[in-house]
Amino acid sequence: MVMGVIIIGSIFIKQSLIVTSIFFNQQYPTLESVAERWGLTYSKDAEFELVFENNILSLIKRDEPKLKGISVDFVSGAVAHRRKFGGGRGQSIAKAVGLKQGVTPTVVDGTAGLGRDAFVLASLGCKVIMVERHPVVAALLEDGLRRAYEDSEIGEWMNARMSLFHGSSIDTLADAANAAGTEIDVVYLDPMYPHREKSALVKKEMRVFQSLVGADLDADGLLKPAMELASKRVVVKRPDYAEDLDGVKPSTVIATKKNRFDVYVKAAMIS
């Protein structure tokens, strides 16, 4: 067990470095528990609200009530559709992390966000340790994992393959690996990158998410610790217009319609 880390099931929690004020119904014990667990401070003037309805924890931007709340759902909706019909190991992300016949790497997702890329990799057989530094996002991820672990269809392999570590990626990538007790083949990074000014059609959900967490202005500092941790490769997901992370040219690039995967190879993937 890593010093300063609480391990509860598959959730690893370090004291948050981000002080976050949030609004929630203080008469609701579930929300009180979430706030205490993740170090969230109640404020009646907070920009965001946490709600718990129909067994789902959601985040709402209070000054834009028409926007749909954000939650993490690994069981149904878009991620379930992608798991069933998304192209399997032929997907670009699978190629980027080195998934192939006889090779199923262990991955640290150093910038988990809402966990969608991590879930894709886990559904394809990878063991994935998600690292998320923002306490509100980590709370949403934990809630999504809770429901996924309980699901009759995916619960067994989700328990075995997906875990969450709360802490700053720059400081705690190695802590996450140590807590998991396994060698890390791949570190996957998808830092939040500012959208172009003309990009007015950013999905509403992403607008809410970005206004909560902001851009990862320290993203360049992720590459060095990621390279030190990964035994095989580091994969960085970038918008097609973004510069190389930390100005370092990747070994190879896998391009998609709007994004690209920059792959920094350290060693071959051997089955």
Curated annotation (Swiss-Prot):
Keywords: Cytoplasm, Methyltransferase, rRNA processing, S-adenosyl-L-methionine, Transferase. It comes from the Bacteria. It catalyses: guanosine(1516) in 16S rRNA + S-adenosyl-L-methionine = N(2)-methylguanosine(1516) in 16S rRNA + S-adenosyl-L-homocysteine + H(+). S-adenosyl-L-methionine binds at R116, D117, E132, R133, S168, S169, D190. GO terms for cellular component: cytoplasm. It is found in: Cytoplasm. The keyword Magnesium does not apply. Its EC number is 2.1.1.242. The keyword Nucleus does not apply. GO terms for molecular function: rRNA (guanine-N2-)-methyltransferase activity. It is an enzyme of class 2 (transferase). Its main location: cytoplasm. Disulfide bonds: none annotated. Belongs to the methyltransferase superfamily. RsmJ family. Specifically methylates the guanosine in position 1516 of 16S rRNA. This is Ribosomal RNA small subunit methyltransferase J. It comes from Shewanella piezotolerans (strain WP3 / JCM 13877). The gene is rsmJ.
